[in-house]
From Swiss-Prot:
Biological role stated in the UniProt entry: In the 1-cell embryo, probably together with gpr-1, controls nuclear rotation and spindle elongation during mitosis. Complex of gpr-1 and gpr-2, in association with lin-5, activates G-protein signaling to affect mitotic spindle force. Polarity determinants (par genes) may regulate lin-5/gpr-1/gpr-2/goa-1 locally to create the asymmetric forces that drive spindle movement.
Lineage start: Eukaryota, Metazoa, Ecdysozoa, Nematoda, Chromadorea
Principal subcellular localisation of the protein: cytoplasm
Domain of life: Eukaryota
Region Disordered: start-end pairs: 489-525
InterPro entries attached to this UniProt entry: GoLoco_motif, TPR-like_helical_dom_sf
Record's protein name: G-protein regulator 2
C-alpha cells in the first residue's frame, strides 16, 4: 500500500469538523451536512476509526437525500475500514446498514452476500466469535425479507430460504446456550422465529410464539419489543379476522406512543387506518390517516405519504365527502404521476365522479369543486381552485393529462396583479419600511448561524494515493507500520481500487427513500 509522509490535520481538527457536520444534520440541514463531511474527507486523516465514522455519517446523509447508490458505496467503505482494524461491533453495524440499503434498492443478492460474509468474518476470527450470533440473526432476517418479497418465484427456492432461516435460528439458540458474552436477545430470536413460522403458513404456532415474545418482553421491561411483536403479529399471524388485526395494531400503537420512535407511530397509524377502512370504520380510519399525514410531513417520511393519501381519499368517499376526497386524490396523483400507484388514484376519482353524476340532475354538469379544509397544512392555491369535471375521469390517460397540466401550472411564476387606483409609494416610507424589515431579520437568526463555518485549508489540496484508494485516507507510513490489519480486507480494497476510482463527485443514483431510520448522534471515538 502506497502511503505519503503527510499525516493531515490532527484528529482534534477532524473531530471538530465531523461534529459540525453532525450538528447540521441534527438541524435538518442535510445538504450542508453533506458538504461539511466532504470537506472533512478532503482534509483527510490517518485515524482509521475516525474515518470509518465519517463514512458512516456520509452514508446516512446520502441515504436521507435519496442518493442511494452513493449511500451504499460509503457504507461499504465504512465496513472495510472497520474490518481492517478488527472492530467487530462496528463491522456488524456497518453490515446491517449495507443490508438495509441493498434491500431498499431491491438488491437482494447483494444483501444476502454481505450477510453471509459477516458470518464468515466473525466465525474465522478468534476475537470475533462472540459476534457470530448477531451475524446469523442478520442473515436469517435477510432470508425472511427475500421470502416475503417473493424474490424467488420458485416455491422450492422460497422453502429453501425458510429452511436456511430455521437453521440460523437453531444455531443462534445453541450459541446462546454456550456463551454469555455476545448472546443475542431472546426477544429478537422469538420475533424472527415467529415471522419464519408465519411465512411458512404455520399460523397457529406463529401466534403462540408472538404471544410468548410479548409476555417475555413485558416481564423483562423490553417495551420497544412489545410494539414490534404486536405489529408483526397483526401483519403476519392474524390472517383472516380483522377484529384481531385491529386489536393488535391498537396495542402496537399504544406501546409505540409511549416507548417507540415517532416513525413507528406513523407506520402503525397508517396501517391501522387501512385496516379500519377495510372493516367499515370509515371515520376513525380517516382520523388516523389524517394524523399520520401530519406526522409524515413533519418527519419527512415521504415513502408512506402515497398510501396514506389513498386511504384518506377512500375514507372520505365512503363518508360521502367527495369534494374533500378529490383534493387528496389530486395530491396523491401529483406525487405518483410516474409510478404504478397512479392508477389507484385514478380509480378513486372515477368512483367519486360516478357517484357525483348519479346524484346530479340530468340538466346539470357533474363536477367537484375542491375542498381542502381537512388538510391543516394546505397552501396550494392551484389545487384549491381546481374543479374536477366528469370528462377529466374518462380514462387513466385523460386523468394523467389533467394532472400533468396541474403540475405544469404549478411551475409557472405567479403573476402580480396591479391594483387599480394604486397610490404612488412615498420614498421615505419605503426607506423606513426596508429598515424595519432589516431590524426584524437581525433579531430572527436562523439555526444555521450557530453552526461553525466550514473551514478551508491548503491541506485539502494535498492528494495522496492512499487518499484515492479510500476517500479521506491520509496514511502515515510510520503509523501504518506499527498497525495490524486484516490482510484479506486490505487485499480486496487494493484490488478494487485498481478497477475503479472512488470519487465524492461521481454520479448519484436518485431513488425514493426515507432515511431517518438511525438517530443522528455524535459518538466520541
Amino acid at each position: 500500500m502506497d502511503v505519503s509522509y503527510y499525516d493531515g490535520p490532527k484528529d482534534e481538527v477532524i473531530e471538530a469538523m465531523l461534529k459540525s457536520a453532525v450538528t447540521a444534520m441534527k438541524l435538518g440541514q442535510y445538504e450542508d451536512g453533506k458538504g461539511r463531511l466532504e470537506d472533512t474527507m478532503e482534509f483527510g486523516t490517518s485515524n482509521f476509526q475516525l474515518l470509518g465514522t465519517i463514512y458512516m455519517y456520509y452514508g446516512r446523509v446520502c441515504r436521507h437525500l435519496n442518493h442511494d447508490a452513493k449511500a451504499l458505496e460509503f457504507f461499504e467503505h465504512e465496513l472495510n475500514m472497520f474490518k481492517l482494524i478488527f472492530n467487530y461491533p462496528e463491522a456488524c453495524d456497518s453490515t446491517r446498514r449495507i443490508v438495509q440499503q441493498a434491500l431498499k434498492m431491491e438488491k437482494f443478492s447483494k444483501a444476502r452476500r454481505f450477510a453471509e460474509d459477516l458470518i464468515d468474518y466473525t466465525s474465522n476470527k478468534k476475537n470475533g466469535e462472540k459476534y457470530i450470533g448477531q451475524a446469523r440473526i442478520l442473515f436469517a432476517s435477510v432470508c425472511l425479507e427475500g421470502c416475503e418479497r417473493d424474490v424467488e418465484s420458485n416455491q422450492d427456492e422460497k422453502k429453501k430460504l425458510l429452511s436456511i432461516c430455521a437453521e440460523q435460528i437453531a444455531a443462534v439458540k445453541l450459541f446462546n446456550e454456550n456463551n454469555t458474552e455476545g448472546a443475542v436477545s431472546e426477544t429478537k430470536i422469538m420475533l424472527i422465529e415467529a415471522k419464519c413460522l408465519s411465512l411458512d403458513e404455520k399460523y397457529e404456532e406463529s401466534r403462540r410464539k408472538y404471544q410468548e415474545c410479548i409476555d417475555f418482553a413485558i416481564k423483562t421491561d423490553q417495551f420497544e419489543a412489545v410494539h414490534i411483536a404486536y405489529y408483526d403479529k397483526a401483519l403476519y399471524a392474524e390472517t383472516y379476522l380483522l377484529f384481531f388485526i385491529i386489536r393488535d395494531l391498537r396495542s402496537a400503537l399504544f406501546y409505540a406512543t409511549k416507548f417507540g420512535k415517532e416513525r413507528d407511530v406513523v407506520k402503525y397509524k397508517s396501517k391501522l387506518s387501512e385496516e379500519m377502512l377495510r372493516n367499515g370504520e370509515f371515520h376513525e380510519a380517516y382520523l388516523y390517516g389524517l394524523e399520520a399525514l401530519v406526522s409524515i410531513r413533519k418527519l419527512g417520511l415521504n415513502e408512506h405519504i402515497g398510501d396514506v393519501l389513498l386511504t384518506i381519499a377512500k375514507c372520505l368517499i365512503a363518508l360521502g365527502k367527495r369534494r374533500q376526497a378529490a383534493y387528496f386524490i389530486i395530491l396523491g396523483s401529483v406525487l405518483t404521476i410516474n409510478q404504478s400507484s397512479f392508477k389507484l388514484f385514478y380509480e378513486q376519482i372515477d368512483v367519486a365522479m360516478n357517484q357525483e353524476r348519479s346524484e346530479t340532475a340530468t340538466d346539470q354538469d357533474a363536477c367537484l369543486a375542491i375542498d381542502s379544509s381537512p388538510d391543516p397544512t394546505s397552501s396550494n392555491d392551484m389545487i384549491n381552485k381546481f374543479v374536477v369535471k366528469l370528462e377529466h375521469a374518462t380514462n387513466v390517460e385523460t386523468w394523467e393529462m389533467i394532472v400533468n397540466g396541474i403540475i405544469e401550472d404549478q411551475k409557472k411564476p405567479v403573476a402580480i396583479e396591479k391594483k387599480e387606483n394604486e397610490e404612488p409609494v412615498d420614498m421615505m416610507d419605503l426607506i423606513f419600511s426596508m429598515s424595519s424589515r432589516m431590524d426584524d431579520q437581525r433579531t430572527e437568526l436562523s439555526a444555521a448561524r450557530f453552526i461553525p463555518p466550514r473551514p478551508v485549508s491548503s491541506a485539502s489540496k494535498k492528494t495522496t494515493k492512499s487518499h484515492r484508494i479510500l476517500p479521506g485516507l491520509r496514511a502515515n507510513w510510520t503509523k501504518v507500520q506499527s498497525m495490524k490489519f486484516d490482510g484479506h480486507t486490505m487485499n480486496r480494497i487494493l484490488k478494487r481500487s485498481k478497477k475503479s476510482k472512488s470519487s465524492l463527485d461521481s454520479t448519484n443514483s436518485i431513488q425514493g427513500d426515507d432515511t431517518r431510520s438511525d438517530d443522528v448522534t455524535m459518538t466520541s471515538k
